[in-house]
UniProtKB/Swiss-Prot annotation:
One of its GO terms (biological process) is translation. This is Large ribosomal subunit protein bL32. Keywords: Ribonucleoprotein, Ribosomal protein. Pfam families: Ribosomal_L32p. GO terms for molecular function: structural constituent of ribosome. PANTHER family: 50S RIBOSOMAL PROTEIN L32, LARGE RIBOSOMAL SUBUNIT PROTEIN BL32. The keyword Ribonucleoprotein applies. Belongs to the bacterial ribosomal protein bL32 family. Transmembrane segments: none annotated. The keyword Ribonucleoprotein applies.
């Protein structure tokens, strides 16, 4: 089993974990339907950037 040769300091441990934090999703209000959706994604109505690009899933 691998064992560290030297103790990792709290600072180095925390720097190692700096990329593990969760990021909140970028949620915006869709101007065509008025519902919440992820930014830069097609809404459930099939609209993207004010234009219908896919069939509606609703």
């Amino acid at each position: 089993m691998a064992v560290p040769k030297r103790k990792k300091s709290k600072s180095r441990r925390n720097m190692h974990r700096s990329h593990l934090g969760l990021v909140a999703p970028n949620v915006v209000i869709d101007p065509t339907t008025g519902e919440y959706k992820l930014s830069h994604h097609v809404c459930l109505g099939g609209y993207y950037n004010g234009k219908q690009v896919a069939k509606s899933k609703v």
